[in-house]
Regions:
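Regulatory nucleotide-sensing modules
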Residues: 1-39, 175-228, 237
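Alpha-helix N-cap/N′ positions at the starts of helices
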Residues: 6-9, 83, 126-136, 193-196, ...
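Cyclic-nucleotide recognition modules
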Residues: 46-103, 233-287, 295
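Short, structured interface segments
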Residues: 91, 96-119, 161-180, 283-294
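TPR-adjacent "capping" and linker segments in tetratricopeptide-repeat scaffold/adaptor proteins
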Residues: 115-133, 184-187
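Short, Lys/Arg-enriched, Trp-marked, Pro/Gly-tolerant hinge/linker segments that flank
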Residues: 120-125, 297-309, 327-332
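Phosphate-/nucleic-acid-contacting segments
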Residues: 127-177, 309, 316, 322-402
């Protein structure tokens, strides 16, 4: 393994918030103490955190290549182990407890971000993600004559809501379809699982404690919206889904159905060590995926912290650029591939009531609408203006809580 030992004096900056992760490394504290400081001020989110021996930091941005989410400062003379992102796989195979420690820290951070997002914007709460809604899902599938799927939803409703208001009706539906009240048992100790075409792997609103890796076949991810099935994605061999189950035992936000005969690897906290040892490439991909989730939540929170509607719209455009890791240079251009209405929806605005913001947005010299599609003629100008809006909002918030 190629790790470096780095020494930092008291007060030395290891990296700065919003800086590029160059080189792409993260750190483990061998001796000393490091403070993480986040400039973005949001109620419910820790602004400062002190880390000590054995703790790690900078994993998310090292693994994804996104800008740093906080500044890291050595508060005493410290010795750090610098780990290049491409050595991560080797590191976790030699220390599976470290991989699980990273997962646990991700869980805490995501929960913190999600709670803050919920507190700021009620529209971000997904009220449908509740086991009691399994009954409604079963009813919808029953009416569409998808009886196997309906039976699954009703069985899960009885399992998770044994004293629910619709228990009698759920049992009646199952009797009509000549289906058992209890679903077939799944051997949780078995990693490899086989699903026939059109078989449900899990459904929205169902509590989950496993993620899945597709070994063979393909899986359709969908969600029922206003009585209509919306396909969110079709995943193929090598893809990972249901990954939030390793972080938080919340109900599923979507349904997964085998698009063809499938062989999956089911991973939970109990067999995660085995995955790390036997399939380190998959474990690395999983932690990279979770790192993306954290970065996305961080940027969503930063966007919500901007008070000015135009600032939020511009920042949302910048997020799309950052997601694709497009270099921001003077006069560099970018085609966002989205309409003005799409952009309004992305920040939770109603397109029928907020057209004035789009009109104001297109007055910017570096923004244009080309056949309804938003384009940027100068990414550096976009980046600079978003920075101004962000600083302005932070000053206002800090004054309120001073």
């Amino acid at each position: 393994m190629t790790f470096s030992i780095k020494n930092y004096s008291r007060g030395a900056y290891i990296y700065l918030e919003n800086s590029e992760p160059v080189p792409r490394v993260f750190y483990i504290i061998h001796q000393g103490q490091v403070e993480l400081v986040r400039e973005m001020f949001t109620v419910g989110v820790e602004q400062r955190k002190v880390l000590g021996k054995g703790d790690f930091f900078g994993v998310e941005t090292a693994m994804t290549g996104h800008k740093r989410m906080e500044s890291a400062i050595s508060t005493v003379a410290s010795t750090l182990i610098e780990v290049p992102y491409d050595q991560f796989r080797i590191l976790i195979t030699r220390s599976t407890p470290l991989a699980m420690k990273i997962i646990r820290s991700f869980s805490i951070k995501l929960r913190e971000f999600d709670t803050a997002i919920t507190n700021i914007s009620v529209e971000h709460v997904n009220l449908e993600e509740d086991p009691s809604h399994l009954f409604d899902l079963g009813k919808e599938w029953y009416n569409n004559r998808r009886f196997d799927h309906a039976a699954y939803a009703f069985q899960k409703y009885l399992q998770y809501c044994p004293k629910g208001n619709n228990v009698s009706q759920a049992k009646l539906y199952l009797q009509k379809m000549n289906k058992p009240l209890v679903p077939p048992k799944v051997n949780k100790a078995e990693i490899n699982r086989f699903y026939a075409k059109d078989q449900i792997i899990f459904c929205e609103n169902e509590p989950g404690d496993e993620l899945y890796i597709i070994k063979k076949g393909s899986v359709k991810i969908s969600k029922l919206i206003s009585g209509k099935e919306t396909i969110l994605a079709v995943l193929k061999s090598g893809d990972i889904f249901g990954e939030m189950a390793l972080l938080d035992n919340r109900p599923r936000s979507a349904t997964a159905i085998a698009a063809e005969d499938c062989e999956l690897a089911a991973i939970n906290r109990q067999n995660f060590d085995k995955l790390v040892i036997e399939q380190p490439v998959m474990a690395e991909r999983l932690i990279t995926l979770l790192s993306e989730r954290i970065w996305t939540a961080y940027r969503q929170l930063a966007n919500l912290a901007i008070a000015d509607p135009i600032g939020r719209l511009l920042d949302m455009l910048l997020i799309q650029v950052e997601k694709e890791k497009v270099p921001i240079r003077p006069k560099s251009t970018y085609n966002f591939g989205i309409s003005g209405e799409d952009l309004l929806k992305m920040v939770g605005m109603d397109p029928s009531k907020n057209q004035q913001y789009l009109i104001e947005l297109t007055k910017k010299k570096y923004i244009e609408l080309d056949q309804g599609i938003i384009k940027c003629k100068n990414l550096e100008e976009l980046d600079k203006e978003v920075s101004v809006f962000r600083k302005r909002s932070m000053k206002k918030v800090k004054k309120q809580f001073a």
